Amino acid sequence: NEEWVQGRNHSAIEIFNEVLKNHPSGTQAEEALFRLGEIHHFSLNNSTRALIYFQEVLQMNRMGPFSYPTQKYIAEIAEFGLKDYDQAIIEYQNLINHYKNENEGSDHQYRIASIYYKKQNYEQALVELNILLENYPDSSWAEESKFKIIEVLYTLSRCPEAREQYRHFTLEYSDSRFKEDMDFVVASCLEEEGHLQEAYNRFKSLEGRYIYPAILKMKLVGIEQRMKKNP
């Protein structure tokens, strides 16, 4: 392990292969395969090879001491390395189903919701975010999930629901870090529904506070032009 930390990957690989030769099964073999997976994943940037090692760990012992971190790596490689989103969803679901004791279910549920969002399957993203809130109400992801729900509702042109959720949210989290983003979403809803003056006032109130001033400026100019056309 020390040799790997010092960056001498190939030497470490030889050592772990030697361990596997002498101990083809059991905890030492599981650790050797796990470490080989980590070396290929992090140091050699070979996620495909790493995946093979990680899968071998699980084949050897699905409930062993290395199985949970291994399953996490497999899910992350599927999502971020291979961008195989359908497989990633399966792997995160495996984490939720098989490792309840780890108390990280809400993290994996949030990843599933995020993947559906990335896939632009907003209806399913909404379902997954609501599952997160139902199953893990005290999760550290709760606040962000509630914000994401408002964002998704706006994306789905379900503005009355988005505004309703916004009202609940502001009562629950009076000084949320998502406040500006949510105000922007609600202003966009008002604009979409044709409440131009109200939308304009909301956008205007975000000046100096919103993280993307250029987009805000574009919104204000766009509404000004629409109001000139339809006074």
Where are these regions (language model features)?
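Acidic, polar-rich low-complexity tracts and alpha-helical solenoid repeat scaffolds
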Residues: N1-P231
